[in-house]
């Protein structure tokens, strides 16, 4: 995917996502086009606390966190495409289909998340996501998010 490069640094990401340490899983946005696609990066460090238990002696980045990183990338794309939310509104992760894990992600990897907008229907926005390491697919899924007021 090539287009005019639009990047977002961590300060801008923090303005868009409600996530914070230790659950913020997007380090930088490499490129995006509003309403179309977004490419983001997660640098995987051995210092992540979950590696103590997943798995001792054989650290593997948890698959659910790969999905969460892709979901956070969809949230950024949604915010950049729709604009600011009203006070009290959030984008919620609403569903996932066709999730597949192809290979493990380990400390030292740089994981690239590519998400593309598919459609909005009945208040749900659908995205296709893929995570790559060294150009190889590690995970792919279809994800949905919903714009909603906080309960």
Curated annotation (Swiss-Prot):
Keywords: Cytoplasm, Lipid A biosynthesis, Lipid biosynthesis, Lipid metabolism, Lyase. GO terms for cellular component: cytoplasm; membrane. Its main location: cytoplasm. The keyword Lipid metabolism applies. InterPro entries: FabA_FabZ (IPR013114), FabZ (IPR010084), HotDog_dom_sf (IPR029069). The active site is at 54. GO terms for molecular function: (3R)-hydroxyacyl-[acyl-carrier-protein] dehydratase activity. The keyword Cell inner membrane does not apply. It is found in: Cytoplasm. CDD domains: FabZ. Its EC number is 4.2.1.59. It comes from the Bacteria. Belongs to the thioester dehydratase family. FabZ subfamily. Oligomer. This is 3-hydroxyacyl-[acyl-carrier-protein] dehydratase FabZ. It comes from Escherichia coli O9:H4 (strain HS). The lineage of its organism: Bacteria, Pseudomonadati, Pseudomonadota, Gammaproteobacteria, Enterobacterales. The gene is fabZ.
């Amino acid at each position: 995917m090539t287009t005019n490069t639009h990047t977002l640094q961590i300060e801008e990401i923090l303005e868009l996502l409600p996530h914070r340490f230790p659950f913020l899983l997007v380090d930088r946005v490499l490129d995006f086009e509003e309403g179309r696609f977004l490419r983001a990066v997660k640098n995987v460090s051995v210092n992540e606390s979950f590696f103590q238990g997943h798995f001792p002696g054989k650290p593997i980045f948890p698959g659910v966190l790969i999905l969460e990183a892709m979901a956070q990338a969809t949230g950024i794309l949604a915010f950049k495409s729709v604009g600011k939310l009203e006070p009290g509104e959030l984008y919620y992760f609403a569903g996932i289909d066709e999730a597949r894990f192809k290979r493990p992600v380990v400390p030292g990897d740089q994981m690239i998340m590519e998400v593309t907008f598919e459609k909005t229907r009945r208040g749900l926005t659908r995205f296709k996501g893929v995570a790559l390491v060294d150009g190889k697919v590690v995970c792919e899924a279809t994800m949905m998010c919903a714009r909603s007021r906080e309960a």
